[in-house]
């Protein structure tokens, strides 16, 4: 949720507490870096910007691996390890909940380009799913490792929506935890 850049002066940020500025990278394990590279670079459009062939001791044994980085527009990256010994680290679980995912911000044209490349590569409407959440429109797809990705386009008035959400976030959470599970998303198409 981009809306506006976070600062340490936000009313909900603890005074004087410095926050990280952005994600550097989010790393996962794969058993096939070439299939993973093809998906992220050729279909999604994230360039491979670094590949580290490594041998290191962590925590108590030598590990031989390759670590790749696929760059997003803000300079952050999605990263993938492949280990010489596949038993050294488990890959991404293929049976994870669809609620466990990485959401990437993009504009409509980029989202459509990604969808077009996926369709061109044979991804069906059930493999690459569009969903209108009201405050954003999302494209969901699993990568070849089973990792769920979301490509999100915020609505134009997202900064105002986020201001409203910031003002009520703690109250809504307390209400929900107390058992009142009434939806507060009046932006969904089914509410209009």
Predicted regions and their residues:
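Residue-level structural signal for beta-strand termini and adjacent loop
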Residues: 54, 83, 152-154
